[in-house]
Amino acid sequence: DTNHFADADIIVVDIPLDISYLDEDPKLDFSSFLESLSVISDKIKKGCLLLIETTVPPGTCEEIIAPFLRDELGKREMGLEDIFLAHSYERVMPGENYLASIREYWRVFSGLDEHSALECRKFLETIIDTVNYPLTELKSMTASETAKVMENTYRAANIAFIDEWTKFASSIQLDLIEIIEAIKIRSTHSNIMLPGLGVGGYCLTKDPTFAPAASKQIFKKEIQFPFSRLAVRVNNNMPLHVVQVLEDNSSKKISNANILICGLTYRPDVSDTRYSATEILVSRLIEKGADIILHDPHLSFGKNFLWK
C-alpha cells in the first residue's frame, strides 16, 4: 500500500537498477527506478529521510535522482529542501550471518547537503554498532556511489586476476593453492583469491560496468575502463575453462557422462541463483551431451525449475 509512504519518517530505497549490454557496451536504464521514485515522491512527507541504498553508477543521485525529485516534488508545491536525500550503500554478506553483516560492519555515507548527511548519520547509528564500526562520511553522494562501484570492481578484478594463473599452473602441473597460501603470508597480499568456478550473484557480475556506463551516459566522458571490462569478460568465461578441464582429465567423454553438480547458488548458505557461475557450467555441459544431476540443499527442484 503506497499510502504508507506518507507515514514514514525514513524511506530506504533498495530497488534494482537495470543495465543492458549491446556489443559489450553497457547501457543504463533508469526508467523503472525513477518510476518507483515517482510513486514515493507523490506520498513522501516533509522532513522524511530518503536513503538510497541501491548500488548505482557514480553521479546517479546528484545528476539523475535529485533533479527528478525536484520536479516531482514541485507538483505538490514541495521542494528538494523539504526532504533529506542521502546515499549509503549496502555492505552485507548474505548467508548464515546476514544480520550481523549489517550491524557489525563499517558503512560509508553522504548526503545532498550537510543536513541530509546528519539525518543519515543519526539513522545509521540506530542500526549499526558504530562504537566498534565507525561510519565514514564522504564529501558527496557521487563519492559514496563511486566507493561502492570501485569496491566491487576491485573484488571482481581480483577474482579475474587468478584465472590466468590457474590455467598456467594447470598446464605445468603446479599446485596453485599451495603457491597462493605461501604468498598470502605476506600481509600486503593476504586477499589474493583462490581458483574457482567464476563470479556469480547480482553485484560483482554487473557493478564493474557501472563506471564506463556512468562516464558515457551521465558525465558525457569517453573513459573506457578497459581493465574493468576485461575483468567481467574473464570472469564470465571461467566456467568454460572448468568444462575444458573436465574434458582433458576425464577418462570418459562428456557426451556419455553422468555428472553430479553439488551447489547451484552463487555462494554458500543462500537460495539465490542469480547469475550463478554454475548455470553457465551446467548449460555448457548439457550442450555437450552430458546427463546432469543437480543437488543443492537450499533449492527445490522440479520440472519447472528455473535459475532466478
State where each predicted segment sits.
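Structural/interface elements that position substrates and couple domains in central-metabolism enzymes
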Residues: 1-308
